[in-house]
Curated annotation (Swiss-Prot):
This is CTP synthase. The gene is pyrG. Mg(2+) binds at residues 72, 140. PANTHER family: CTP SYNTHASE (PTHR11550), CTP SYNTHASE-RELATED (PTHR11550:SF0). Keywords: ATP-binding, Glutamine amidotransferase, Ligase, Magnesium, Metal-binding, Nucleotide-binding, Pyrimidine biosynthesis.
Length: 545
């Protein structure tokens, strides 16, 4: 199969939405029957984002094969059917690590290791490998043109475009076309300078996607075309929208997909966007609204919970309600108590690491349990629910996780002592193990108890969800907790690890050790999120009634 490559760069400012624009183009091409994949090349030195602060970098998206990746891969999976893997995201740090490892082994036969050709060759090899087996591979380059960090990646894709030829490569550049209120017009100079910077390193964009808060007028498109040496039909206006799921239709209306397939000489049918039209219709026509309190510790940056936010919105589509997310700092719950949890239709406690704010999450679980308020716990959200139940129902005073209190008299949650590395080898984990890449990661099979809310939600007796954690329920306490009324409704494939818990006499008190948000999409939803929002809707109606 001959793979065509679309390289996506950004200029003027960061946070223009390269990932969303690239994913939207991928969605249109997929709707034309093409097999599309995507890649994100990140210029930072970290080997992967696994140990980066969520409040700086946003969430870590976990793929089926257990790679800890950039949150843009979450956008990719929400827009196209192709599942991402560890080949779809790599960093400068990963490239340098692999090149230096080869140098230490003597693979370069004593050569002087340089950015060109050794680093650029390594980048090109990964890009080509990631695109194998697909009709089109869309490659997003992180950062902004002009950044020092991005230069090796830009040089690599410049070389690739020469090697692949025009029939197999295309450059799409996102820029900002700001509107100046004082002048009463949009300004194209930032775009012109950004393209000039890109051309100075040997890359001439074939498509310009112009971001702004309003459409770019036709006369300004003509001006951009003239000064940036890009066909006028390839100057695409992409204004701000109230829903990112409208973007595929906006790009298609301007003929971007047709331009791409003609450039690549691909014969394929017109794009069928009826699934996206349905998503947009459901989003625009809710029959009600529910308020979900998300009790977390990274709420100053909502992108730290990007997939959770999106999964709640998707669940709203399937329940025909809009979901209003109220972000609640778990430390505020510790300081002010239950008053900050009033007026909610459901509580969701997402994942997290470290002791800060844990008691606030435990209090949130207690409030939901005692007030029959729908509760959904994810990863740490399961652990705090279990700790709360152990303390206040099972009579295990002082129960805790050894992550937060190594001297707890009742360690109901403890460290997983074995883990499998990327090569598939079993290694021992202990308190001083490296933080990076030493968790239980990726898709795992879970057996569900018959008749449980979990089994009803999934409409079956198994599910496969993605994990990212070091700590698990301590099996030594299972019998005592079960006798107190807790149901262990999900177990690992070998039935040795607890994957899900729930309370049978509660409208919806369900928690999973995994991260179901990573498998939610606007077209398909996710069973547990759909069930949770349905329970929140029912709670609201009962409360109002």
């Amino acid at each position: 199969m001959t793979t065509r490559y679309i390289f996506v760069t950004g200029g003027v400012v960061s946070s223009l939405g390269k990932g969303i624009a690239a994913a939207s183009l991928a969605a249109i091409l997929e709707a034309r029957g093409l097999n599309v994949t995507m890649m994100k090349l990140d210029p930072y030195i970290n080997v992967d984002p696994g140990t980066m602060s969520p409040t700086q970098h946003g969430e870590v998206f976990v793929t089926e094969d257990g790679a800890e990746t950039d949150l843009d891969l979450g956008h990719y999976e929400r827009f196209i059917r192709t599942k991402m893997n560890r080949r779809n995201n790599f960093t400068t740090g990963r490239i340098y690590e692999e090149v230096l490892r080869k140098e230490r082994r003597g693979d370069y036969l004593g050569a002087t290791i340089q950015i060109i050709p050794h680093i650029t060759n390594a980048i090109k090899e990964k890009v080509l490998a990631g695109g194998e087996g697909h009709d089109v591979a869309i490659v997003e380059i992180g950062g902004t043109v002009g950044d020092i960090e991005s230069l090796p990646f830009l040089e690599s894709i410049r070389q690739l475009s020469v090697e692949l030829g025009r029939e197999r490569s295309l450059f799409m550049h996102l820029t900002l076309v700001p509107f100046l209120g004082a002048a009463g017009e949009v300004k194209t100079k930032p775009t012109q300078h950004s393209v000039k910077e890109l051309r100075s390193i040997g890359i001439a964009p074939d498509v310009l996607v112009c971001r702004g808060d309003r459409p770019v007028p036709a006369n300004e498109k003509a001006k951009i075309s003239l000064f940036c040496n890009v066909e006028e039909r390839a100057v695409i206006s992409l204004k701000d929208v109230d829903s990112i799921y409208k973007i595929p239709a906006l790009l298609k209306a301007q003929g971007l997909d047709e331009l791409v397939v003609k450039r690549f000489g691909i014969t394929c049918p017109e794009a069928d966007l009826h699934e996206w039209e349905q998503v947009i219709y459901q989003e625009a026509n809710p029959t009600g609204e529910v308020t979900i309190g998300m009790v977390g510790k990274y709420i100053e940056l909502p992108d730290a919970y990007k997939s959770v936010n999106e999964a709640l919105k998707h669940a709203g589509l399937f329940n025909r309600v809009s979901v209003n997310i109220k972000y609640i700092d778990s430390q505020t719950v510790e300081a002010k108590g239950e008053e900050v949890l009033q007026g909610l239709d459901g509580i969701l406690v997402p994942g997290g690491f470290g002791e800060r704010g844990v008691e606030g999450k435990i209090l949130a679980a207690k409030y939901a349990r005692e007030n029959n308020l729908p509760y959904f716990g994810i990863c740490l959200g399961l652990q705090v629910a279990l700790i709360e139940f152990a303390r206040h129902v099972a009579g295990l005073e002082g129960a805790h996780s050894t992550e937060f209190n190594k001297e707890t008299p009742h360690p109901v949650v403890g460290l997983i002592t074995e883990w499998i590395n990327e090569e598939g080898n079993v290694e021992q984990r202990h308190e001083t193990s490296d933080l990076g890449g030493t968790m239980r990661l990726g898709a795992q099979l879970c057996h569900l108890s018959e008749g449980s809310k979990a089994a009803i939600s999934y409409d079956g007796n198994t599910c496969v969800e993605r994990h990212r954690h070091r700590y698990e329920v301590n099996n030594n306490y299972k019998d005592r907790l079960e006798k107190a009324g807790l149901v262990f409704s999900g177990l690992s494939s070998d039935r040795q690890l607890v994957e899900m818990i729930e309370l049978p006499n509660h409208p919806w008190f369900v928690a999973g050790q995994f991260h179901p948000e990573f498998t939610s999409t606007p077209r398909d939803g996710q069973p547990l999120f759909v069930g949770f929002v349905a329970a929140a809707t029912a709670y609201q109606k009962r409360d109002l009634g």
